[in-house]
Design a protein with these regions (language model features):
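Start-transfer (signal-anchor) and selected internal transmembrane alpha helices
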Residues: 1-30, 220-227, 305, 309-325
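Periplasmic/ER-lumenal interhelical loops and adjacent helix-loop junctions
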Residues: 40, 232-304
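Membrane-embedded helix bundles of polyisoprenyl
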Residues: 107, 111-120, 129-170, 175-208, ...
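Hydrophobic, aromatic-rich transmembrane alpha-helices
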Residues: 293-315, 325-330, 375
């Protein structure tokens, strides 16, 4: 698509994103100084980190938040969306008291979620209407709405979709440049996305090496990405604390359940389904919450049908995405695997494995790329099975009704 088409799509996505933000926050909370909707600890904590950062002078590294209590570390270790915090600090003398950019950020997350999901589906269908309707399945997902409710920086799921768009697109021109930009930007939003994107980049790069045996390009590609990433992380303050301080308790606790895609509840007090019952899980698995929604669960059955209609060709064609999903699922389920409340496996990891894995203590979040791959390929399968369009609308309505409580 040409630049004009992309611009129009982006503007429309922003308009839809703004409308969704009004529904999400309420019209009265759209202002950039309104804090009444800060009811979650994480949102309040992020706001305080931003306030301290804006009221401090510039330091080096640029993200240093020296007055933030006893922490005295970088803004990147808060959830205050570092890239927006840095931009806000440039203009801090012109900003109102109690300023925050959170409604703008939520609008951008909704908008880019629509933008990239539309482009992914359009890449396979070349159908504008189908792609637009499909994009709303990526918006009305519990994992996105749940995160935007209190973990603002972790609402940037569009980063995952943007990366998949690069890999799934037929146009590979300048893909290395776009990958560097995307992975670098992710480090200015939240490091969990950086780990996910870098892992995906390394995986696909290695897969291409196995296919084409181009060792020179494999090395060059990953060195360029790594240098760009490390330099960015250095300038914004990732290394102001010792690496050992990033290790901690959590891996094997903040994980995902084997039934996470079908379990609408991550605690006894919350449910995301009007129709499906709470399956049950164990403490800590809220980080791996991955309920698809009834509409998407039904949609995924069409993916299963499509796969088995042409089993061998489908497996060969999508082997790399199957392997990638297995890797992320293993990380999300960890060494302590549960089916509902029942503990299936609990392996004791040696220290040399547990220590590096402790960096991703909330490993349940690694379910997200798999979650979006399920939606992407389910929508593509639905289209290729030539099912009447009105049934897709029906599934979207079912999804909305199911999430209504």
């Amino acid at each position: 698509m040409n630049t004009k088409s992309n611009f129009i799509q982006l503007i429309l996505s922003l308009a839809i994103g703004f409308v969704l933000t009004i529904f999400f926050l309420g019209y009265e909370n759209i202002g950039l100084t309104k804090t009444n909707w800060f009811i979650k600890y994480d949102t309040i904590s992020d706001f305080l980190a931003l306030k301290f950062f804006l009221n401090d002078k510039w330091h080096f590294p640029l993200g240093l938040n020296s007055n933030y209590g006893d922490l005295n570390n970088s803004i990147v270790f808060s959830g205050a969306v570092p890239i927006f915090s840095l931009i806000s600090k440039i203009f801090k003398n012109f900003l109102p008291y109690n300023f925050h950019f959170f409604p703008i950020w939520i609008t951008i997350c909704f908008a880019l979620q629509i933008f990239f999901s539309y482009k992914i589906i359009f890449n396979f269908t070349k159908d504008n209407v189908y792609s637009l309707i499909s994009s709303f399945f990526f918006i009305f997902t519990p994992i996105l709405i749940y995160r935007l409710g209190f973990h603002l920086s972790l609402g940037a799921h569009w980063l995952i979709l943007a990366y998949f768009f690069l890999e799934l697109s037929n146009n590979k021109k300048n893909i290395l440049f776009y990958k560097i930009i995307l992975i670098t930007i992710s480090s200015l939003i939240h490091f969990y996305f950086t780990i996910m994107l870098f892992m995906m980049s390394l995986f696909f790069s290695f897969y291409r090496y196995l296919e084409f045996k181009n060792l020179k390009f494999f090395i060059k590609e990953n060195i360029f990405i790594l240098i760009s990433l490390v330099l960015t992380m250095y300038f914004v303050g990732y290394f102001v604390i010792p690496p050992t301080d990033t290790l901690g308790y959590g891996y094997g606790f903040y994980k995902s359940n084997l039934l996470t895609f079908f379990d609408p509840s991550y605690s006894d007090l919350d449910t995301w389904s009007l129709f499906l019952p709470d399956i049950g899980n164990v403490k800590g698995e809220f980080e791996g919450f991955g309920y698809l929604g009834l509409g998407i669960i039904i949609l995924s059955f069409f993916l299963i049908i499509y796969i088995f209609k042409n089993f061998i060709p489908n497996i060969k064609l999508n082997l790399k995405y199957i392997l990638l999903s297995i890797i992320f699922l293993l990380l999300a389920f960890t060494n302590s695997i549960n089916i509902g409340n029942f503990e299936l496996i609990n392996l004791k990891l040696p220290t040399f494995l547990y220590a590096p894995l402790s960096v991703i203590r909330a490993s349940g979040r690694f379910i997200w790329p798999v979650y979006y791959l399920i939606i992407i390929f389910s929508l593509i399968a639905f289209y290729k099975l030539k099912i009447k369009f009105r049934y897709l609308l029906l599934l979207l309505i079912i999804q909305l009704i199911d999430l209504s409580p």
